[in-house]
Amino acid sequence: MLSQNNNALGIIFPNSYDNTVPELVTERTMASIPFAGRYRMVDFILSSMANCGISNVSIVVRKNYHSLMDHLGTGREWDMARRHGGLNIVPPFAEKGVRIYSGRVEALGSILNFLENQKEKYVVMSDANIAVNYDFNALLAAHQASGADVTIAYQKVEIPEGRKNDNYTLTVDADGRVTELLFNDYRSGKQNLDLNIYVLEREILIKLVKDAAARGLIYFERDILAHNVNILNIRALEYTGYVAHVCDMKSYFDENLKLIDEKNLNALFPKQSPVYTKIRDDNPVRYVTGSRVESSILADGCVIEGTVENSVLFRGVRVKKGAVVKNCVLMQDTVVEPNAELDCVVTDKNVKITAGKKLSGTESFPVYVQKNHIV
């Protein structure tokens, strides 16, 4: 990890976009959804911050955060187990009879005292619905050079039909200034998609949050940024690297399988910027005589006796003799019994597929099996 004093603290919102993947967040947050064989979604943003020398990071949780706390622990894997700063899990603060926050402004309002007591000049904020290896130092440098009040990271991309809900797009002029911020933009063609990564001065953030809270506003993008594009100096920085967006079950399925392509895998996991995660001591993958594996990602602890094709298998998955797994994403400790057949299936943790069972979805509608279920 880089040792660099960039004078910035990080804030991650793990529950943002929980509503887009309800199947996967009944007992967890978006941030703790398993991804890419052995990681969680939060690992990517948190590792990016760690690699850029941001060592004071707060994760502002809302609900279902026990699995996230278990995964992050003290933050040791990210070099954030520190007496001063380090990794902080901030629970929802709500008085009796007061609802827990729903928008980013309310979330920030609940930690205003914390923000006011910090020493860093800048704040970088992010959600956890994207897997990206992001250079926050480049964002900070661009922000400082432009003299902006707020700088937004964006990606120029064509948003598929059916995935345009809960997205913000930007109109950016030739000087990089944001002139318009749109919610649920249904225009066709490539758009400037807001990656929900922001940097601004801590004092400016505190002022914006206080002003918004006084007026009963709750959404950072919609209520603050969009309504103040002509008042605030809002700049945008394009990101041209690899981004995996998780916005529904299909995208979760697709983005995992895309990593089977070595080009995509190397783009998300460059050697110079590693992604850290909770360590689990497992044996290497064991391939039993007669097994067959093609074009797949297999994490440590897997035992393969049958056939696996074009699939992503998380830690501890077992595919027994005669079983066939194709185009699947099987989470931790899934067991596929003898002669079962799976095609276009997503299993959550600790699922058991009984002997001879056949499950088949499609690329557009993969079958999902809930955590701890037996089929």
Could you say what each language-model-derived stretch is?
Residues 1-257, 369:
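Unchanged
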